[in-house]
């Protein structure tokens, strides 16, 4: 799998979003993705279980002063999956 950074553009809440995704590391076959919006680091996400029971995307690390939109994280995760398909 290519771990080069890539751009995603998609619609979220009726607004176009542009996100840079930087795959940053791989541990035990799990890849972590740094998410950059407007050239600013927002958070690192990874696939995993949400609330311990359903598959989805979760935050592995975040910038303390940034708010987190859980719906946006799930949308970005789906877009990452689509990018690799």
Predicted regions and their residues:
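A generic structural signal for beta-strand entry/edge sites
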Residues: 5, 30-32, 54-58
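Intrinsically disordered, low-complexity linear regions
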Residues: 16-18, 30, 69, 73
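Intrinsically disordered, low-complexity acidic/polar segments
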Residues: 17, 28-30, 44, 54
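Negatively charged, low-complexity tracts enriched in Asp/Glu with abundant Ser/Thr
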Residues: 1-28
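Acidic, low-complexity intrinsically disordered segments
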Residues: 43-85
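Short aromatic-centered micro-motifs
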Residues: 10, 35-36
């Amino acid at each position: 799998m290519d771990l080069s950074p890539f751009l995603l553009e998609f619609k979220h809440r009726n607004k176009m979003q542009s996100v840079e995704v930087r795959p940053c590391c791989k541990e035990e076959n799990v890849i972590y993705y740094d998410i950059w919006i407007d050239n600013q680091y927002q958070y690192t996400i990874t696939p995993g279980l949400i609330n311990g029971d359903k598959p989805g995307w979760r935050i592995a690390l975040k910038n303390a002063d940034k708010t987190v939109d859980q719906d946006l994280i799930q949308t970005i995760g789906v877009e990452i999956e689509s990018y690799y398909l």
